Amino acid sequence: IRGGKIHVHVIGNSSGKISPKGICGSGIVDLIAELFLEGWIDIRGKFSPEKTNLIQKREGQLCIEYAPGLYFYQKDIDEFILTKAAAHIMVEIMLRESGLELNQADRFYVAGSFGKYVSVESAITIGMYPDMEREKMINAGNSSLEGAQKLLLNKELLADIDQILEEMTYIQFAEVDDFLEQMVAAQALPHTDYKKYPTVMEKLKKRQNICFY
């Protein structure tokens, strides 16, 4: 969002002649992050229609026209916030079960095609990723496919896999005592405990002149 307008990029549109037809997963992360930083949605992810005329009411609910004829609805934001909250608490619970603080983690690996294209800054802004040193965040790409290829070429890696399996800890998140409490806390943008996200608070201060104490 620049100058009160939403600027979009179409994947593979090097000529600039292709109009957007919809929004992808990484685009949703960017959109929600920008809406939040601009103050067009609040900490709960709810639209603030008084902030811009791009927010309007259609089909009985608020939405924003992010491209000509394309709308992102309040229910879309609500549903995605549940997804990002789940991602956040999985990291928190894994760290807790490992007996580690976030600053003790050497690396944060993001695997899969979604992780390959999502903006790290946007994911941190909405609280989907932890707010940590950016150089520690590693895009692992399609690690499952790469691992399968390596195993096909070198069967000796089976011994490494067996060792990893022995060292792994299985966590049933639904059985964690404070899972629901953690889930509710993580549904705020970026989190109910904003001290977990100091760099996001700094961005808000610069974009909206908001101070947190």
Over which residues does each language-model region extend?
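Helical "lid/coupling" subdomains associated with nucleotide-phosphate turnover
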Residues: I1-Y213
